[in-house]
C-alpha cells in the first residue's frame, strides 16, 4: 500500500519552523495495522512548503533540510516500511515554480538514496511517480529520468499510467484534449510499457516497475481535470483489464482508493483479482482463439501451485450490459487437467467443459465479454 504520512492534516505539509519531527499517533496506528496484516508499505517521501506549495530542492540548504526529514522518517519506520518513494509527481508545475526539472530531481535522488541506504539497508528506493503518461510533456520528462545516471542506484521506477484511460472508441476516456498527448493511448499503452522497461534496462536499471493511482471515476467522484463519466460497472471492467495488462507485463499494480460503499462492483473485481492472481507471474504458453469477436486480448500466467491461468476479454468500450460472444479456445500441449472459469465481476466460478484435440485441450462455446474471464487449468 502506498501512503503519505501527514501529521498536520494537510497533504504533504511539514512545519519547517520546528526543530524536531513527530509522527501523529493516528498515522502510527495506520502503519502498525498494515504491518500486522502483512501489507507491504510504500512511504512517499514528499513535502511541500505550506505557504507556497514549493518543493524544497532549489538550494543545498533546502536539500539538507529535506534529507534531515528523510533520515528521521526512515529511521523511525525501519523494518515496517518496505519501499520509500522520492517525491510524488515531481514534474508537476503549479502557479508557483514547484515543478522540478529532471536535473534537479536527479540531484535530489543522488543525495537521498545514500541516506535511505544508511538508515535501512533492506528498504527499496523508488523514483519517478510521474503523472499521466498519456501527455507528451510527461513522457519527455520521464525519458529524461530513465536515461539519467540514477537508474542503477534505485530499486523501483513508478508512473501513473491510467487516469480514466479507455479505448479510442470510448469518449469517456478523453482527458484534456487540447494538451498534446499520445494518439490511441489505450491501444499503444502496452508498447509504451515495453519501451519504459527497455530504456530503463539499457541504463542499468535492474529493479521493479510499478504503476500507481489507476482509477476510473464515476459522476459521484468527479474531478475537474480527469474523466469521470464511467459507471461502477464499466469502471470495474477497466480496473479488471488494467490489473491483468500490468500483471501480464510484469508491472506491480497500484490503484487509487476505491470505496466499497460507492463502487461495489469495482471493489468486487479488485478484491476478486487480488485473490485469484495472488502469486501469479506472466508465463506465455500457446493459446488459439477462434471467434467473431474483434480485438480479443489475452494474457497467460502461472501460479506457485503449477496451475496455469488464462485471462481473456474483448477490448472495446466497456458497457454495463455486454451480451457476450462465443469463442473456441485451444490450448496446445495441455493434454489434461481441469478447467475452471472465474468471473470476478459476478463473483462466480464453475467448471468449464473441455475435450482433447490434436494433443491439446479445446474449449468450445466459451462466452467472453468486455472484462477479463479467468480460466484456471489445474494439474491433472
Question: Regions from the language model: what does each represent?
Answer:
Residues 353-380:
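C-terminal beta-strand-rich structural cap/linker in extracellular carbohydrate-active enzymes
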Residues 20-28, 66-67, 105-111, 138-144, ...:
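Well-ordered, non-membrane alpha-helical segments in soluble/globular domains
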Residues 1-174:
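Substrate-binding cleft and catalytic face of glycoside hydrolase catalytic domains
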Residues 330-348:
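Solvent-exposed beta-hairpin/edge-strand motifs
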Residues 21-24, 162-224, 240-254:
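Glycoside hydrolase catalytic-domain groove-lining segments
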Residues 116, 197-200, 274:
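Conserved hydrophobic residues forming the short capping helix/wall of the S-adenosyl-L-methionine
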Residues 290-335, 373, 378:
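Carbohydrate-binding surface patches
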Residues 211-296, 304:
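Aromatic/acidic polysaccharide-binding cleft in carbohydrate-active enzymes
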Amino acid at each position: 500500500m502506498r501512503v503519505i504520512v501527514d501529521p498536520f492534516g494537510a497533504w504533504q505539509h511539514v512545519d519547517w519552523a520546528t526543530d524536531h519531527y513527530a509522527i501523529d499517533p493516528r498515522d502510527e496506528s495506520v502503519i502498525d495495522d498494515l504491518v500486522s496484516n502483512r501489507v507491504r508499505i510504500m512511504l512517499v517521501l514528499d513535502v511541500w512548503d505550506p505557504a507556497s506549495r514549493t518543493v524544497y530542492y532549489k538550494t543545498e540548504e533546502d536539500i539538507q533540510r529535506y534529507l534531515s526529514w528523510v533520515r528521521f522518517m526512515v529511521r523511525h519506520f525501519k523494518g515496517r516500511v518496505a519501499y520509500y518513494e522520492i517525491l510524488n509527481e515531481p514534474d508537476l508545475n503549479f502557479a508557483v515554480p514547484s515543478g522540478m526539472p529532471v536535473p534537479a530531481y536527479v540531484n535530489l535522488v543522488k543525495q537521498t538514496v545514500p541516506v535511505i541506504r544508511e538508515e535501512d539497508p533492506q528498504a527499496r528506493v523508488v523514483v519517478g511517480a510521474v503523472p499521466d503518461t498519456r501527455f507528451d510533456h510527461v513522457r519527455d520528462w520521464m525519458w529524461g529520468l530513465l536515461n539519467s545516471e540514477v537508474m542503477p542506484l534505485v530499486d523501483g521506477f513508478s508512473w501513473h499510467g491510467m487516469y480514466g484511460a479507455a479505448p479510442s472508441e470510448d469518449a469517456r476516456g478523453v482527458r484534456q484534449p487540447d494538451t498534446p498527448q499520445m494518439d490511441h493511448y489505450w491501444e499503444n499503452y502496452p508498447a509504451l510499457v515495453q519501451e519504459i522497461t527497455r530504456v530503463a534496462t539499457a541504463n542499468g536499471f535492474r529493479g521493479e516497475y510499478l504503476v500507481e493511482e489507476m482509477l476510473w471515476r464515476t459522476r459521484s467522484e468527479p474531478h475537474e481535470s480527469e474523466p469521470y463519466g464511467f459507471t461502477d460497472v464499466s469502471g470495474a471492467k477497466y480496473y479488471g483489464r488494467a490489473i491483468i495488462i500490468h500483471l501480464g507485463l510484469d508491472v506491480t499494480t497500484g490503484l487509487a482508493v476505491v470505496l466499497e460503499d460507492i463502487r461495489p462492483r469495482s471493489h468486487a473485481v479488485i478484491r476478486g483479482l487480488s485473490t485469484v492472481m495472488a502469486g501469479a507471474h506472466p508465463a506465455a504458453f500457446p493459446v488459439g482463439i477462434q471467434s467473431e469477436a474483434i480485438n480479443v486480448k489475452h494474457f497467460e500466467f502461472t501460479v506457485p501451485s503449477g496451475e496455469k491461468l488464462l485471462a481473456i476479454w474483448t477490448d472495446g468500450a466497456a458497457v454495463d450490459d455486454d451480451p457476450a460472444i462465443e469463442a473456441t479456445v485451444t490450448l496446445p500441449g495441455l493434454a489434461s487437467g481441469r478447467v475452471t472459469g472465474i468471473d470476478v465481476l459476478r463473483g462466480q466460478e464453475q467448471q468449464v467443459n473441455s475435450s482433447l484435440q490434436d494433443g491439446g485441450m479445446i474449449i468450445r462455446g466459451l462466452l467472453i465479454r468486455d472484462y477479463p474471464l479467468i480460466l484456471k487449468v489445474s494439474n491433472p
